[in-house]
A protein has these predicted regions:
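Conserved RecA-like ASCE P-loop NTPase motor core of nucleic-acid helicases/translocases
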Residues: 164-169, 188, 195-230, 238-240, ...
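Walker A/P-loop NTP-binding motif
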Residues: 154-155, 174-180, 193-207, 228-229, ...
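Short, compositionally biased segments
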Residues: 2-16, 170-188, 381-384
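Pre-ATPase regulatory/linker segments immediately N-terminal to the P-loop/RecA-like helicase/translocase core
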Residues: 19-23, 30-157, 227-230, 239-261, ...
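Hydrophobic beta-strand scaffold positions of dinucleotide-using enzymes
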Residues: 169, 188, 281-283, 306
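Conserved helicase/translocase P-loop NTPase motor core
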Residues: 266-298, 315
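Conserved helicase motor core of SF1/SF2 NTP-dependent helicases
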Residues: 207, 218, 232, 285-287, ...
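Pre-Walker A (Motif I) flank of P-loop NTPase domains
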Residues: 158-165, 179-184, 209-210, 278
Length: 389
């Protein structure tokens, strides 16, 4: 049985008066701190008395601590001290539902799902384009390769093929169609995320119409992007959090960039308010929230996905399929050589779900250095010093 779906025998401790018109109880759960089972705010837990009763009651989790969860039931649920219950932890299907929603959306997705040479709209960065970039981060200005990468992203025409930044955390590999791969030894602090942040700030500075959705597989990775963009201020930057996230896990310096209610539960702004932000940062799963609010496809001129090598392709598609139109540019940053997506199903893994979107794209001919020809510029900057592949 999945570690997230199991039955246990448990005792409830009543929490009288916490919520009016609700039966509120505290449930002790062994292994909660280790994520076995994984329980988040907003999850549902089913309980049934251990006697002859066959009726299951549904409780909603409204607080999670190291070894207990607080549950709210309807007012018709009651118990007394010492009464034993069977407890069933139910898998939270919201991420799966958002993946299915994204995959079933009808859209002209050939350009970013199965890009071909005919979809490429840009040649190599020229001297004029490169000189037009005034680095905001001095580390970028001191690194020619990183600067060239930023220039390439900034000057991509709308509707280009996905732009890929790839390599391990201490190196960035630059990819262009000259039958070579360029290995750049980066200075500390000039990795992929720094390059992504610089590109975002350059895009914002050059065009007031630019609107960006920046995603990452985990809250920690998304928080890192938001922290490095906080110079934009709360009027331009919004850190979009799922209601299931614990408030205490958000870095304090980002609290002015998000929205939460009086119970310290993260909330979602109105569509009008969300559309006013120039940069929205979220996890890949929460990247589907704007679509749920009614934000139209194409509202975001650019979609960035950092650590794209670690998320399943359906995760990446949540933001791309719901928010991209034929003019939206997509930028992926990640390392196809590192550990890929975590897939529990052996069947799904064998059928390819353990291969990230970034990895699959890089295997296509349009990104293949050995078969691509001519001067077509595909993914990242051409370096002055070439190293034979």
């Amino acid at each position: 049985m999945s570690p997230n779906i199991r039955d246990i025998c448990a005792l409830f401790l009543p929490l009288n008066g916490v919520y009016p018109n609700c039966a509120t109880f505290r449930l002790e759960v062994a292994g909660l701190a280790e994520g076995r089972p994984s329980v988040l705010v907003g999850d549902f837990i089913l309980v049934k008395r251990r006697d002859a009763s066959t009726e299951w009651y549904k409780g909603c989790v409204h607080e999670v601590s190291a070894d207990t969860v607080n549950l709210r039931f309807s007012s018709n649920f009651s118990t007394y001290k010492g009464k034993k219950f069977d407890v069933r932890f139910v898998l939270n299907r919201l991420p799966l539902r958002r993946m299915h929603q994204a995959l079933t959306l009808k859209t002209d997705a050939t350009r970013f799902l199965f890009p071909e040479l005919e979809h490429v709209r840009m040649g190599r960065v020229n001297t004029e384009q490169l000189s037009s970039i005034t680095p905001i981060n001095r580390l970028i200005g001191e690194d020619y390769e990183q600067l060239m990468t930023v220039a390439a992203i900034v000057h991509q025409p709308p509707g280009s093929v996905p732009f890929i930044i790839f390599g391990p955390s201490v190196h960035v590999y630059f990819y262009s169609v000259v039958s070579v791969i360029h290995d750049v030894n980066c200075r500390p602090g000039t990795g992929k995320t720094i390059t992504v942040v610089e590109a975002i700030r350059q895009l914002l500075a050059r065009d007031p119409k630019v609107s960006i959705l920046a995603c990452a597989p985990s809250n920690s990775a998304a928080d890192l992007i938001a922290q490095r963009l906080r110079v934009l201020g709360p009027s331009q930057l919004f850190r979009l959090n799922a209601a299931s996230r614990e408030y205490k896990t958000l870095p304090e310096i980002l609290r002015d960039f998000t929205l939460f209610n009086g119970n310290l539960v993260f909330a979602t702004p109105s569509i009008e308010r969300l559309k006013k932000y120039r940069v929205v940062v979220a996890t890949c799963v929460s990247g589907g929230i704007p679509h749920g609010l009614g934000v139209r496809q194409g509202h975001f001129s650019h979609i960035f996905i950092d650590e794209a090598g670690q998320c399943m392709e359906p995760d990446a598609m949540i933001s791309i399929k719901t928010m991209a139109d034929k003019w939206t540019n997509i930028v992926l940053a990640g390392d196809s050589k590192q550990l890929g997506p975590s897939v529990r199903s052996h069947v799904a893994s064998a059928l390819g779900l353990n291969k990230s979107y970034l990895t699959r794209l890089m295997a296509r001919e349009v990104y293949d250095l050995r078969t691509a020809t001519g001067t077509t510029y595909l993914s990242i900057a051409l370096l002055q010093t070439l190293r034979k592949f």
